[in-house]
């Protein structure tokens, strides 16, 4: 029996590519099911991505499911210098 061991970066990339395709908020349990891992492991991957700023978590509310979503890519703002006359 071959055990499929992926690195942390491979797991995170898999999460990002899968959920950028469906483009809707997702639950930890959905990530766990997609990756074939426990909810605890999925939460670990999601928290790593959150720390990197690649995804964001819904505000924590008592009794509500945590939803995750891909962070919007923000472009750096362009500064223009004013030239004095």
UniProtKB/Swiss-Prot annotation:
Gene3D superfamilies: Winged helix-like DNA-binding domain superfamily/Winged helix DNA-binding domain
Pfam families assigned: FaeA
Keywords (A to Z) from UniProt: Plasmid, Transcription, Transcription regulation
Any GO BP annotation: regulation of DNA-templated transcription
Family statement drawn from the similarity comment of this UniProt entry: To E.coli PapI and DaaF.
Function: May have a possible regulatory function on the expression of the other AFA-III genes.
Protein name: Dr hemagglutinin AFA-III operon regulatory protein AfaF
